[in-house]
Amino acid sequence: MELVDIWHFLLSAILIEARGDIKAAAEWVEKRIAALDGQEARKAWIFEKEYRLDNMDPIEKLELLIGFSVFRKISIPLFDAILEDCQMSWQDLFRQYIGKNVLNFFRQDFGYKAGSYRKHWHDGREDNVHLVEILAELNDDSDNFKEKLYAAMQVRYEIRGSAQ
């Protein structure tokens, strides 16, 4: 789930760069993801310095991503390499991103802002753990995936004694 949070921050930076133009931001991302097939997909560039991603371990890639962030730079090939290191696809990322978004709405609906929401549910595990389990059970191809996810979370949260 941490990569979802990182992706969220990258998307926010892309939107800021696009001055809030969602279509332009989406086109920027789509263009760069589509370009991931070639030889350049295994490289990241910053200030004319080339980094060969295939020669880096996951920690080095994360450190490079942090360095890019310091200079407000975004490298889709670098993020893609990190996804690969974590054995995640872009589809996995998309699915988890939607899940995290639904979880944030769920938290708000059940009192997060007021302080009554319990992040640790009946079994002492965090809501993120339950989210991962529910995501594994659901088909994300359905038209009402978000609604099914929310409903499944609500059942676990309420029936298992976590709601106040």
Predicted stretch roles:
Residues 1-164:
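Flexible "arm" and connector segments at domain edges
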